[in-house]
Amino acid sequence: MKKINFLTLLSALFLFASCDTGNNSIGLSNWSDDGKVYKWHLGTENAVNVAINVDKAMQNRDYTLLRNFLSDTVSITASNGVKYDLESFITRRLEIDSIVDSRNASLKWEFSNIYSVDLDPTRGGEHVSVTYSGEYKDENGKDTWNSINRYYVMDGKVVWWNTFNQDIIDSEN
């Protein structure tokens, strides 16, 4: 009987000891403020939700709501390299909305992937990547593109936002 209890205890210890309960990480990056090399960790759903809320506000052209998800000191870099602060970005978005409306055009996009990764889960801040497909259409035709927005999210707000675009060449057969 003692032998069976000992084997049961030993099996249970082996089972629990063999489970990896550590924080999984992968890859490497020296993209940090201290210059150290870190591994990537999975981010949180909270940071992903910030990106989803930014998208909802942009889709609805609700720039008052958008302010809730961007820090007052946010740095935004468009795909053409132009940099914006919060106020100049919203001013530019209002101009773009006006141009789209005056041309009776449509500007649509939808995301296909959102994920968050973190270099150091013990310090705040997560890198969120959002992949989009977009389309602008007016009386002259349409333009389509793929886009990646990269956000750095801290305390529920985007601190910086970079956009990268790839035009899609539509060919007719």
Model-derived segments and their meaning:
Residues M1-A17:
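Sec-dependent bacterial lipoprotein signal peptides
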